[in-house]
């Protein structure tokens, strides 16, 4: 496919990027830490951590992983925490030790956590105490040999940290009881690390940096193997696209999305580290009043988010009173940005929401709207520099201009493959082209618009939910004979999970089934609706026709609207 989108690039955006400007994320980090040493890198709960402090602490943590725990280059280390100052310290410590970061959603259930730890072969995990009870239930059944435990306030000043830890544990009661007698505290790890010798390993571009877990095209969570070069390439692509709006050493980005999510990891953490910017870490973005109070304290210049976050902020009266004069980049991703939200955003802030598209397997950015656009296109924008894109039919032939086809992409940001799953890798990457599973159309200027999903994935507040996983859990309930999970529109989260169930036990209720799901699934995966049926539609070979149920369910929602 001819790169027609290049003609629509702003004049200051290049067609190609250099993914080899740095040899590794370690080199990028150390360069930024030297250049911006005394500038703030992260702020959380009012506590500022400069680049110098981050460099010192991450070096100590790397030394502890090497000398204290005896871990080697290439070992996998899991990170399970929300946005806290501990996160970047641990993240860059792991990378500087030549090890591989395995990001874990802290809201995972024991079943989900056990799978990810074992699949990745994680040798160690850094976890915040609020979720230690989850780890306790499965740690003996996993590959984990070392547990490093931290509390919410452990990277704050002594007085503030003591207060935060007391309130979190005893007032808000957010730390369920747990028993991990062999765990070492994060503070102790750093104290030991400061006295140990950090040995800088040779880290090259093709070394793995992250195992970033995703469902891919099936419900089994798989680790996308992202190399240092993959991440560096995507950083260069983001910087080339948004760079004209950004000023090195002068940015403050609002990081309300969790850093364990690939979007915030690349767009917020890594990009603004390279730019010498400051990340305002929001630990609990669901507390909208608390988030707005934080925003009122800082002249934020950039903000990333998903539609649900932007919508919630717009509906907060205090947010409407904030000063947006410093804001010059608003980027939306993870899920479609609704027109009404985009229109309200530009009316309030004076800034257009630049919507983009990506997937974990691409580190994640594939396309974005150009920075000079002065309207909400409703599209996912143009392919980023050094990226090829094509639309194909079911036989892998390119479709005619203007026709819908599966979006396939090729570029330096595309993952190596899925960790220890060559068959799954071969299904999604063919001749170097990554098949996204999303059906798109491209207009004459190269703007892409997603019109459907080839795969049955459900997108809840920017998180992928896979029907296979939901159905596997529901089928464990003794009262269920058959089940199909589909996505239906939701005003609050973009989509929500709906179940169609054939009962085995006539007494089964929707409340009982949802309660059962809550015990086995992370919150965003829990079904919001249950519809009981005498039978489910099937193909001539007995396969449940999810698409038919999904179209029917969406039709009911549309009719109600």
Swiss-Prot record:
Gene Ontology molecular function: ATP binding; long-chain fatty acid-CoA ligase activity
Known cofactor(s) = Mg(2+)
Reactions that this protein is recorded to catalyse: a long-chain fatty acid + ATP + CoA = a long-chain fatty acyl-CoA + AMP + diphosphate
Compartments where found: Membrane
GO CC entries: membrane
Q: How does it sit in the membrane?
A: Peripheral membrane protein
Q: What is this protein called?
A: Long-chain-fatty-acid--CoA ligase
Signal peptide range in chain numbering: none
Q: Could you tell me what this protein does?
A: Catalyzes the esterification, concomitant with transport, of exogenous long-chain fatty acids into metabolically active CoA thioesters for subsequent degradation or incorporation into phospholipids.
Please name the pathway: Lipid metabolism; fatty acid beta-oxidation
Q: What is its main location?
A: membrane
The protein's UniProt keywords, in alphabetical order, are: ATP-binding, Fatty acid metabolism, Ligase, Lipid metabolism, Magnesium, Membrane, Nucleotide-binding
Which GO biological process entries does UniProt record here?
fatty acid beta-oxidation
Give the source lineage, highest ranks first.
Answer: Bacteria, Pseudomonadati, Pseudomonadota, Gammaproteobacteria, Enterobacterales
What is its EC class?
A: ligase
What EC number(s) does its UniProt record assign? 6.2.1.3
Family in the record: Belongs to the ATP-dependent AMP-binding enzyme family.
- Positions binding ATP in this chain are 213-224
Question: What InterPro entries would the database entry show?
Answer: AMP-bd_C, AMP-bd_C_sf, AMP-binding_CS, AMP-dep_synth/lig_dom, ANL_N_sf, ATP-dep_AMP-bd_enzyme
């Amino acid at each position: 496919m001819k790169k027609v989108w290049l003609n629509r690039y702003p004049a200051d955006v290049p067609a190609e990027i250099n993914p080899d400007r740095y040899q590794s994320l370690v080199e990028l980090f150390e360069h930024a830490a030297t250049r911006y040493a005394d500038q703030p890198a992260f702020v959380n709960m009012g506590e500022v951590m400069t680049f110098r402090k981050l460099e010192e602490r991450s070096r100590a943590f790397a030394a502890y992983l090497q000398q204290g725990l005896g871990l080697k280059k290439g070992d996998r280390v899991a990170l399970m925490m929300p946005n806290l100052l501990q996160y970047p310290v641990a993240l860059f410590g792991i990378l500087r030790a030549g090890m591989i970061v395995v990001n874990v959603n802290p809201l995972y259930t024991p079943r989900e956590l056990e799978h990810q730890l074992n699949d990745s072969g994680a040798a160690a995990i850094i976890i915040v105490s609020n979720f230690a009870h989850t780890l306790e239930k499965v740690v003996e059944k996993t590959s984990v040999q070392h547990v490093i435990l931290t509390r919410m306030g452990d990277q704050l000043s002594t007085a503030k940290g003591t207060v935060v830890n007391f309130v979190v544990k005893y007032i808000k009661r957010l730390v369920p009881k747990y028993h991990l007698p062999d765990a070492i505290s994060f503070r102790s790890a750093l104290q030991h690390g400061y006295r140990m010798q950090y040995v800088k390993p040779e880290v090259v571009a093709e070394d793995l940096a992250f195992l970033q877990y995703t469902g891919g095209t099936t419900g089994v969570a798989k680790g996308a193997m992202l190399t240092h070069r993959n991440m560096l390439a995507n950083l260069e692509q983001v910087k080339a696209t948004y760079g004209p709006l950004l000023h090195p050493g002068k940015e403050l980005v609002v990081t309300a999305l969790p850093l364990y999510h690939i979007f915030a990891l690349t767009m917020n953490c890594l990009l603004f580290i390279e730019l010498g910017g400051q990340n305002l870490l929001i630990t609990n973005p669901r507390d909208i009043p608390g988030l707005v109070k934080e925003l009122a304290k800082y002249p934020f210049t950039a903000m990333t988010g998903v539609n649900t976050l932007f919508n919630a902020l717009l509906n907060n009266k205090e947010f409407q009173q904030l000063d947006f004069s410093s804001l010059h980049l608003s980027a939306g991703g993870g899920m479609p940005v609704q027109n009404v939200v985009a229109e309200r955003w530009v009316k309030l802030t004076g800034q257009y929401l630049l919507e983009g598209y990506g997937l974990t397997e691409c580190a994640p950015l594939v396309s974005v709207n150009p920075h000079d656009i002065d309207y909400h296109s409703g599209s996912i924008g143009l392919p980023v520099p050094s990226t090829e894109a094509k639309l194909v039919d079911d036989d892998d032939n390119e479709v005619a201009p203007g026709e819908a086809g599966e979006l396939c992409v090729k570029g330096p940001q595309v993952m190596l493959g899925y960790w220890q799953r060559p068959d799954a890798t071969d299904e999604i990457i063919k001749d170097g082209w990554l098949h996204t599973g999303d059906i798109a159309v491209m207009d004459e200027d190269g703007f892409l618009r997603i019109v459907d999903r080839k795969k049955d994935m459900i997108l809840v507040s920017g998180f992928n939910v896979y029907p296979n996983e939901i159905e596997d859990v529901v089928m464990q309930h003794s009262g269920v004979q058959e089940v199909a999970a589909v996505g239906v529109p939701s005003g609050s989260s973009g989509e929500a999970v709906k179940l169609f169930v054939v009962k085995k036990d006539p007494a089964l209720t929707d409340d009982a089934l949802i309660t059962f799901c809550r015990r086995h699934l992370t919150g965003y995966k829990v079904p919001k609706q249950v519809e009981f049926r005498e039978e489910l539609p099937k193909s001539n070979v007995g396969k449940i026709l999810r698409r038919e149920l999904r179209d029917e369910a969406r039709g009911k929602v549309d009719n109600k609207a």
